[in-house]
Amino acid sequence: MRTDDFDYKLPEELIASYPLENRDASRLLKLNKQTGEILDHKFTDFIDFINPEDLLIFNNSKVMLARLYGEKITGAKLEYLIERVKTPKIFETHIKANRSPAIGSEIYVQDTLAKILEKDGGMYLLELQGNKDIYQLMEEFGHIPLPPYMKRDDEEFDAERYQTVYAKDLGSVAAPTAGLHFSEELMQQIKAKGTDIAYITLHVGSGTFKPVQVDDVNNHKMHSEVISVSEDVCEKIRQTKANGGRVIAIGTTSVRSLETAGQSGEIQPYQGETDIFLYPGKKFNIVDAMITNFHLPKSTLIMLVSAFADKEKIMKAYEHAIAEKYRFFSYGDAMFIF
């Protein structure tokens, strides 16, 4: 299977660089994965597509203010993208610099000195030397790390709009974007309908934006992310399945978490790393339907939805979305695949 099979041409004006005024004002393309039928809806119509016996699974990870700035002792400018916090003083980060800083050297992260402990590929391990920890630095100086395709600096509203309304556990470098469409009001409507809700956690890494760089999909090495699926969530899933309801994953991060926890065929609690790569030919054991945004060409995420719904049906849905001028990517519109 070729990576080029998952390419498509997207007019640049369809990339959503800004969110709509209201979260739930986006559009929703409804795709029947059995028949291939495509229907155009408003996102608020989603309430009509779910039943009381269904279970919605959301990713409650919160985006870190992960973009920071600093300099070398020489004064040369540095830009950081914090990838993962190991302890309050030790963290993994990408560093953008004219010349890569050396292992063992000291550099400034904002106003605080840090030592470079290790380097692995493009990832550095830093230890802060001052009184402040990385959480304090992010809180004081940090910027929302908008995806590169938005081609703009973050603005004040992004701190709210690039987070889901239910975000709780700090740790992501990118938003679990399918959840951005859910307003407080829509969450209340779901509860009022009697549809149950559960939360998993997957801390999204910057690898989510990385295009697949090998020609053969089978040779792609997936990046690793930290997930948590509790026994309470597993029990809700078992009950939902037993009662004939559907497990509806909100976003590909929820899909990957649930399918990691369900790799044996049965859902089990899971805490740790996942590098699960779902592409056509892979089986889904847990998820029955999903909400997801429109994904970048040749990305692992367009491969995931193609595995779930059949590649030809997905590509036809994307063609339809482009023709109908849907908005694409993180701040864009969504699909309901069932």
UniProtKB/Swiss-Prot annotation:
Q: Name one GO molecular function term.
A: S-adenosylmethionine:tRNA ribosyltransferase-isomerase activity
- What's the catalysed reaction? 7-aminomethyl-7-carbaguanosine(34) in tRNA + S-adenosyl-L-methionine = epoxyqueuosine(34) in tRNA + adenine + L-methionine + 2 H(+)
EC no. given is: 2.4.99.17
Q: Indicate the enzyme's highest-level EC class.
A: transferase
Give the UniProt entry's GO cellular component terms.
Answer: cytoplasm
An annotated GO BP: queuosine biosynthetic process
Q: In which pathway does it act?
A: tRNA modification; tRNA-queuosine biosynthesis
Task: For this UniProt record, give its keywords in alphabetical order, as a comma-separated list.
Answer: Cytoplasm, Queuosine biosynthesis, S-adenosyl-L-methionine, Transferase
| Protein's cellular compartments | Cytoplasm
Query: Which family is annotated?
Result: Belongs to the QueA family.
Describe its function.
Transfers and isomerizes the ribose moiety from AdoMet to the 7-aminomethyl group of 7-deazaguanine (preQ1-tRNA) to give epoxyqueuosine (oQ-tRNA).
Q: Which HAMAP family match?
A: QueA
How does the annotation summarize its subunit structure?
Answer: Monomer.
Q: Which PANTHER family match?
A: S-ADENOSYLMETHIONINE:TRNA RIBOSYLTRANSFERASE-ISOMERASE
The protein here is known as S-adenosylmethionine:tRNA ribosyltransferase-isomerase
> Which species is the source of this protein?
Francisella philomiragia subsp. philomiragia (strain ATCC 25017 / CCUG 19701 / FSC 153 / O#319-036)
Tell me the gene name. Answer: queA
